[in-house]
Amino acid sequence: MMIMEIENVRRALEMISSAEDFGILIPEVRSNIVMARSNPCGPEDVVAVPGRITEFQGRAFACRDPEYGASSHMARFIIALNEHLPGRRSALNIKFDESIISICEDMGLVVSSYDRSREPDSVRDTEGGSIPWGVEEALRNSESPPDVIYHRGAWGKEPMIVLTGRDAVEVAELAIKILRKYKSLKGDTR
């Protein structure tokens, strides 16, 4: 099973790396695409891209192949989500833009959010506590299981959108559909 997650993330990474202009979706903190094995307990159960995914000449670019334990932030996200939604084993973070949220809603995706300014001090002061708290809040704020979770940032925290799915290839396909619509909206029809 371990090889399956690595191969799935590798294939997803190839898809987004070959998508022209995918770099316009990459946030300042960079992206990562993750996939957890069933019932993940910690980052060692989650495949990610070491060093994250950056933008180079408009495209998504990764310096290394996916491996287990290569992410902490996105690993904590998918572990927290998977506790409530065991079928969701993969996620990709992209930059926040109101028009991307509108695109997701127009596509019929379930979108939820959380407000980082409402994060309790006890959570903020706990190393690694913010992400699980945010996932819990987004789940509470949604009547249906969300496909997309976002926040508008906070002091020193970049706003972010996270796409979720059953596996990394599904999430990459979704991201590429969003990219096409976003480029069209921005007047780029390449």
UniProtKB/Swiss-Prot annotation:
EC code(s) of this entry: 2.5.1.3
Pfam families in UniProt: ThiN
Claim: Transferase is one of the keywords in the record: yes
Pathway assigned to this chain's UniProt record: Cofactor biosynthesis; thiamine diphosphate biosynthesis; thiamine phosphate from 4-amino-2-methyl-5-diphosphomethylpyrimidine and 4-methyl-5-(2-phosphoethyl)-thiazole: step 1/1
Key words of the record: Thiamine biosynthesis, Transferase
Record field: catalytic activity: 2-[(2R,5Z)-2-carboxy-4-methylthiazol-5(2H)-ylidene]ethyl phosphate + 4-amino-2-methyl-5-(diphosphooxymethyl)pyrimidine + 2 H(+) = thiamine phosphate + CO2 + diphosphate; 2-(2-carboxy-4-methylthiazol-5-yl)ethyl phosphate + 4-amino-2-methyl-5-(diphosphooxymethyl)pyrimidine + 2 H(+) = thiamine phosphate + CO2 + diphosphate; 4-methyl-5-(2-phosphooxyethyl)-thiazole + 4-amino-2-methyl-5-(diphosphooxymethyl)pyrimidine + H(+) = thiamine phosphate + diphosphate
Xref: SUPFAM superfamilies: AraD/HMP-PK domain-like
InterPro entries reported in the protein's UniProt record: Aldolase_II/adducin_N_sf, ThiN
BP GO terms, sorted: thiamine biosynthetic process; thiamine diphosphate biosynthetic process
Single annotated GO MF: thiamine-phosphate diphosphorylase activity
UniProt function note: Condenses 4-methyl-5-(beta-hydroxyethyl)thiazole monophosphate (THZ-P) and 4-amino-5-hydroxymethyl pyrimidine pyrophosphate (HMP-PP) to form thiamine monophosphate (TMP).
Family membership: Belongs to the ThiN family.
This protein's name: Thiamine-phosphate synthase ThiN
Species of provenance: Methanothermobacter thermautotrophicus (strain ATCC 29096 / DSM 1053 / JCM 10044 / NBRC 100330 / Delta H)
